[in-house]
Amino acid sequence: MSWQAYVDDHLMCDIDGNRLTAAAILGQDGSVWSQSATFPAFKPEEIAAILKDLDQPGTLAPTGLFLGGTKYMVIQGEAGAVIRGKKGSGGITVKKTNQALIIGIYDEPLTPGQCNMIVERLGDYLIEQGL
């Protein structure tokens, strides 16, 4: 299965008629493995800051998580594994696997819990596959 199929079929899937606004699978070097057409252009330093927070949890809390120039307030996550952020009625979930970052961005009517489930389910599957 191609990385694009993982984005199209597993991340941008319908949940009760709703879907993520944007999604991507990135290498931990910041390279794009696959992304939805709606995924924002991002800066390398934004990915570096996400990776730093995954290595040293709490570093993004004071400044917020930035992706594509959009600032998300960092909320609860799982140290070293998941970062969750909120902006207005939407937000972001980032799941770290052995080799990749799975990123999902959502807005209402999709809920934070649905975004978390979509992103983390694929991340857990890839971890089980050694990826």
From Swiss-Prot:
Main location: cytoplasm
A UniProt-annotated Pfam family: Profilin
Listed InterPro entries: PFN, PFN_euk, PFN_sf, Profilin_CS
Keyword Signal: no
This protein's UniProt keywords: Actin-binding, Allergen, Cytoplasm, Cytoskeleton
Molecular-function GO terms, alphabetical: actin monomer binding
Cross-referenced SMART domains: PROF
One CC-aspect GO term: cell cortex
Disulfide bond residue pairs: none
Subcellular location: Cytoplasm, Cytoskeleton
Function recorded in the entry: Binds to actin and affects the structure of the cytoskeleton. At high concentrations, profilin prevents the polymerization of actin, whereas it enhances it at low concentrations. By binding to PIP2, it inhibits the formation of IP3 and DG.
Similarity comment: Belongs to the profilin family.
Subunit structure: Occurs in many kinds of cells as a complex with monomeric actin in a 1:1 ratio.
Protein name: Profilin
